[in-house]
A protein has these predicted regions:
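C-terminal cap of metal-dependent C-N hydrolases
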Residues: 40, 44, 54, 380, ...
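His/Asp/Glu-enriched, well-ordered alpha-helical/loop segment
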Residues: 102, 109-115, 120-121, 252, ...
Length: 449
């Protein structure tokens, strides 16, 4: 993988997320969901190496076969993939897609509720706008499904995230209330009153109150709003009811921590609340406790480029973090893409980890592992491990056809399918590029005259 001057490349990409060959027009492909792609390099997304000269067969919007020596039925329309690569649609497990239109405009930002009376009870699926410009930008870059999470504002619990597909004119929320997000570490300490001790006490008390509420009304989860809370309860009825799926194991608990000691504290939660389905978000020092994370079978959403200490809780940060955790047996997905349309950088970050594997003394990922970190592993974390994120038979046909190696910085998406249906690559950025690529003199008066 050709990777040099990574920091400079990241800056250059900020304004040119979509290559000039893409996003000029909707994809030209069979709309029926029944087709085949042949003579293409196939990347399944399960960690295996890419397969050259392969094919993919799709029927009814689902994968029938993918790989080498695949029999293509004669009656199917065929897309010639000569010189191209095909991968599963990219999956980003932690974003604010659909919650923010313009980051600098407060009125268009629903990711942060600074004065809300609720915390765990917040449900972002009710505010997601699939027509928000960052959604189209991310789709044109190969993102087909994403987790959408709120940002913790005035309590350690941020609220309930959703899983969406990015199909044009598609449903806003595929899976509402897909996970709960809680802040610990330095941010959680600040929200809890100034210390990690307070944050841990608040978290454990909240989980106990939710467990007690569930025991008083068996079989109820977020519908338990009609139940009263004890007079000494710290949580509102709505927040306690929203945590019942967490303590009963029906909803994953995403916990944002960075420091090794804080990660150990998260793993200890499982001893008191054995039904918890934990996911660690951040884990900047995860490599220091990688064996413990692997033994607990807790997946991680981590940044690929966190190689410098940005705070006291990331003093041991290293760009080898993801590679070391993966080598220890931890399932690691690349995630945490906030700031509007930044999920588009996922292939670049994954490619950086491939390049890192060639740096003496560093630990990166193989090509197959890197692709899995932005496809099948985040899909599994979001609960779609048997549905999307791979080109295995039976999976939905979320596919991206690329004009080269998708982990190369200069490669762009050519055709994108979600559920086997071709998607438009047109977005606000591509329209601006087309408008000003070849500017023409207009007969209208200048605005400054």
């Amino acid at each position: 993988v050709k990777r040099t001057a990574l920091a400079l490349a990241a800056l250059l990409l900020a304004g040119t997320a979509i290559p000039a060959t893409a996003a000029d027009a909707p994809s030209k492909a069979p709309p029926s969901g029944d087709f085949a792609v042949t003579n293409v390099t196939v990347a399944i997304g399960d960690g295996s190496a890419p397969i050259r000269g392969g094919a993919v067969v799709v029927r009814g919007g689902r994968i029938v076969a993918a790989g080498k020596d695949v029999a293509v039925p004669a009656e199917l329309p065929v897309i010639d993939g000569t010189g191209k690569w095909v991968t599963p649609g990219l999956v980003s497990a932690m974003t604010d897609l659909g919650l923010v239109d313009v980051g600098a405009v407060e009125e268009s930002n629903d990711s942060y509720a600074g004065t809300a009376r609720f915390s765990a009870g917040l449900d972002v699926s009710l505010a997601i706008d699939n027509d928000a410009p960052p959604v189209a930008v991310s789709r044109a870059s190969g993102i087909t499904r994403a987790g959408v999470a709120p940002i913790a504002a005035n309590a350690i619990f941020a609220g309930q995230g959703a899983v969406i597909d990015l199909a044009q004119n598609g449903p806003d929320a595929v899976q509402p209330r897909a996970f709960q997000l809680v802040e610990l570490g330095e941010r959680g300490a600040d929200l809890a009153g100034g210390s990690r001790v307070a944050a841990q006490a608040l978290l454990r008390n909240a989980l106990r109150e939710a467990r007690e509420l569930a025991q008083r009304k068996p079989g109820k989860d977020t519908e338990g709003l009609t139940l009263g809370q004890p007079s000494d309860a710290l949580l509102s009825r709505a927040d306690a009811a929203a945590l019942i799926p967490v303590v009963t194991g029906k909803q994953p608990l995403f916990v944002h921590v960075e420091r090794a000691a804080d990660i150990r504290g998260v793993l200890a939660l499982g001893r008191e609340f054995p039904a918890l389905r934990l996911v660690i978000v951040g884990a900047g020092e995860g490599w220091r406790v990688a064996n413990e994370i692997a033994a607990a079978k807790v997946p991680v959403l981590a940044s690929a480029l966190a190689d410098l200490p940005g705070s006291f809780e990331t003093l041991a940060a290293t760009q080898s973090n993801v590679g070391r955790m993966t080598a220890a047996g931890v399932k690691v997905a690349l995630g945490g893409f906030y700031d509007n349309d930044q999920p588009r950088y996922a292939p670049q970050f994954a490619g950086n980890l491939v390049g890192l594997s060639r740096v003496p003394g560093a630990t990166g990922l193989s090509w197959g592992q890197a692709l899995a970190a932005i496809t099948s592993i985040p899909a599994e974390i979001l609960g779609g491990g048997s549905t999307f994120g791979s080109l295995k038979p039976g999976f939905v046909a979320d596919m991206v056809l690329w004009d080269g190696d998708p982990l190369e910085i200069s490669t762009g998406a050519v055709t994108i399918f979600i559920d086997g249906k071709p998607q438009s690559l047109v977005n606000h950025q591509s329209r601006l590029r087309q408008r000003y690529r070849y500017p023409k003199e207009s007969g209208l008066p200048k605005a400054y005259e």
